[in-house]
Amino acid sequence: MGYHTILSGQRFTFDSVKEVMAKAGEHKSGDVLAGVAAASDIERIAAKDVLAGMTLRELYENPAAPYEEDEVTRINIDGLNRKIFGEIAGWTVSDLREWLLSYEADNETIHRISRGLTAEMVASVCKLMTNLDLIYAAQKIRVTAHCNTTVGERDIMGTRLQPNHTTDNVEGITASLFEGLSYGCGDVLIGLNPVNDTVSSLAEVLKRFDEVKHQFDIPTQICVLGHITTQIEAVKQGAPCDMIFQSIAGSEKGNRAFGFSAETVDEAQELMRTQGTAAGPNVLYFETGQGSELSSNAHWGADQVTMEARCYAFARKYHPFMVNTVVGFIGPEYLYDSKQVIRAGLEDHFMAKLSGIPMGCDCCYTNHMMADQNDIENLSLLLGAAGVNYILGVPTSDDIMLNYQTNAYHDIGTIREILGKHPIPAFERWLEKMGIMENGRLTKYAGDPTIFMKKGR
């Protein structure tokens, strides 16, 4: 079945729902690389016009990957609330957009409707929204989860403290950890990307994180972001761990390229419920990012926004504690410049929240992108206004191990003050006890990691 519209006397024809969706998206270098992007601005507007009139039922009937061949599609479809979908199946994508932006749509009503939405519906409405629409709609939605503490409450903007080190030296990691804590970072997670994906290396870092957490009575979560199978083995061997992590894709083929399947995640979740160190019930952490499916030829000819939305359909089955897009990490082949990175960050956050995901963002870029730190600060502030659950922090914005740039430890204090945000309440009380915060602001001791050495190590 073809689709067509006429704009400025020119007829535009699209062969499939997938083509309409791809060409309706904002310009992304990754979609150009995949050969699915609109050839011109007017073709993009024509595709948006067609998509706006498409019903949610049509999108349900046309998933990006076939149900019979892809477990992400099966999770996406099988997890749908049929009663709620039946109430809105006749809506057009334009109807959904207008409703989301109306006063009728609030946190409770959006959460209910979201149970009747597939990833393709979520991606489609995203494509009809401006950046301001994405911010306005997302800030209506609060998605909370509990591990040791609760993430996602209103007026809370958390951080993952990322003390990466080029050799996984635990003393170097600990020094960076203390610096991050001294700036008020780490309420959502103390989480390291390891250089060495071995059970022994992960266990050594986890033990140090656990020691620091208990020595200073820090209300937070710990995780070392090795491969899911390595983490599983480390926990089985007794390593203390609050959450298990895995990068995920929007297709089964993409996940298998990452070296896992839904069955692996099922095993990890059950293991954490029986041998993990957290209270739970939310004990998983996922990362995503537009373009990963194309990089493994696992995108099924779909655009990167649609495949990203499918990541959230996969994730919501597992009720994770935290999910974040690593928005600019994959490079300019997929997001060319700051305009595309900012747009993608806002898209990912909105789509995840609409999918019921406790969403954060690694506001980052690589050195060969047409972006700089000012752009990342802009994105961080926009996401803060949109109600993002958390961002990441590293020393002076420069991750010396991953060789990319993200937010600095000291950024979060500025953003919280500007927007009237706070750390997770239990963590803020701990910061006050340590003398790092007072009356909602950082004190003169902020940024001084030696306060931890004086108090214990």
Residue ranges of each PLM-predicted region?
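Catalytic domains of carbohydrate-active enzymes, especially glycoside hydrolases
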Residues: 176-189
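Anaerobic metallocofactor- and corrinoid-dependent redox/one-carbon enzyme cores
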Residues: 1-174, 189-457
